[in-house]
A protein has these predicted regions:
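Hydrophobic faces of well-ordered beta-strands that scaffold small-molecule active sites
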Residues: 3-5, 71-73, 112-115, 141-143, ...
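Active-site gating loops and adjacent loop-to-helix segments of metal-dependent hydrolytic enzymes
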Residues: 11-51, 83, 178-197, 236-259
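Short acidic/glycine-rich loop or secondary-structure boundary segments that cap or lie
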Residues: 228-233, 237-238, 272-273
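Acidic-and-aromatic substrate-binding clefts and catalytic sites of carbohydrate-active enzymes
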Residues: 49-54, 81, 119-125, 148-155, ...
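Mid-to-C-terminal alpha-helical segments outside catalytic/metal-binding sites
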Residues: 1, 5, 12-70, 98-106, ...
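Active-site gating/metal-coordination segments in enzymes
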Residues: 69-206
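Catalytic metal-binding/acid-base residues of hydrolase active sites
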Residues: 8, 176-177, 226, 293
Length: 347
């Protein structure tokens, strides 16, 4: 069975918020050809998308063709809208969450869902987080790697993580609004350089700021294999040991200890890096993720894992076992995989 924890979806239509304060910054969908649309931000085209971004039928057909049994659905990060006034941001989040919940409810053996919350208003974010879990039946939430430039250890954000831990909600951190993006205007550098750096910044902030130490029950995962954090763990630990006066002011536990407490997806694009991640973190911390349906993702989810020749027990853990543990979902919910030729213990 393959459970893909990193996939994005959005409704075919979005509300027009242009009359709201800052309304031009809200994303609009401009359908310009059959099965094709543009995401419009600030009056300019941000990204070209195809019907698999919104059509459940197209998505299921592509999942079947690629051998993916379950997708974990989350919104497209450009829709986070943390910059917006809290009320319209909450309105948008509720619409996006209702849409994801509807897709999951219609196909419970093929999808699980993560909501989005207005992180710029912790009170509203917690309220919507509770609704996502208690009313909509979603497994948790996807959040950005910073909130309008505030790192994730900012004190005002702690109650959100505390609520997630209390609710048993999974948290998926996706890079967005990358640091240094003003210097990365060419060559797709925000995606190639900014995102890995942004994720390391998020992880280090949560560790050094003591958030993960204070909330040991928090099930938190990071996209793109945790970005640059795993590759630079030696440097980070050395800095922690050499300058505790700078690094250990809020948490005296070594960053290395958290390699066994956070989750990452498998989207690292390179067999050597995936093997390194496995050696560093173990299979219980790595879950299949593809970034479907976007071009920097893995076109055939699980192909990188399969290419490494891992033992079957390890392979099964990477393809679905870790995902189900992070989401706190039983394999039996997705038992339909067996009727599609792949049981819970098969790839």
């Amino acid at each position: 069975m393959k459970v893909d924890v990193h996939t994005h979806i959005l409704p075919e239509r979005l509300p027009d918020f242009r009359k709201m304060p800052g309304g031009e910054r809200f994303v609009r969908i401009e359908h310009h050809a059959p099965g094709r649309a543009r995401l419009i931000v600030d009056g300019s085209s941000f990204r070209e998308i195809e019907s698999n971004s919104w059509s459940v039928e197209a998505r299921l057909a592509e999942c079947d063709a690629a051998g993916v049994d379950v997708q974990v659905l989350s919104t497209v990060p450009v829709l986070f809208s943390y910059w917006a006034q809290p009320d319209p941001a909450l309105d948008l989040a509720r619409r996006l969450n209702d849409h994801i919940a509807g897709v999951v409810a219609a196909h419970p053996s093929r999808f699980a869902g993560l909501g989005t919350i207005p992180m710029q208003s912790p009170e509203l974010a917690i309220r919507e987080l509770e609704r996502c879990v208690r009313e909509l039946g979603l497994s948790g939430v996807e959040i950005g790697s910073n909130v309008n430039g505030a790192n994730l250890d900012s004190p005002e954000l702690f109650p959100i993580f505390e609520a997630a831990a209390s609710l048993g909600a999974a948290v998926f951190v996706h890079p967005w609004e990358m640091a240094g993006r003003d210097r990365m205007t060419r060559y797709w550098l925000p995606w190639l350089v900014g995102m890995p750096a942004e994720l390391s910044l998020a992880i280090c902030s949560l560790i050094f700021g003591g958030v993960l130490e204070r909330l040991p029950a928090l099930r938190i995962a990071f996209a793109h294999g945790g970005g640059a954090f795993p590759a630079t763990i030696g440097r980070i630990v050395r800095g922690f040991e050499a300058r505790p006066d700078l690094c250990a002011v809020s948490n005296g536990v070594s960053p290395r200890e958290y390699l066994g407490r956070i989750y990452v997806d498998s989207l690292v694009h390179e067999p050597l890096m995936l093997r390194y991640l496995l050696d560093l973190m173990g299979p219980d911390r790595i879950a299949l993720g593809s970034d479907y349906p976007f071009p920097l993702g893995e076109a055939r989810p699980g192909e990188l894992i399969d290419s490494c020749g891992f033992p079957e027990k390890t392979r099964a853990r990477l393809l679905h076992g870790t995902a189900l543990e992070w989401l706190d979902l039983p394999a039996a919910r997705f038992g339909g995989a067996a009727s599609r030729g792949r049981g819970p213990d098969q790839g």
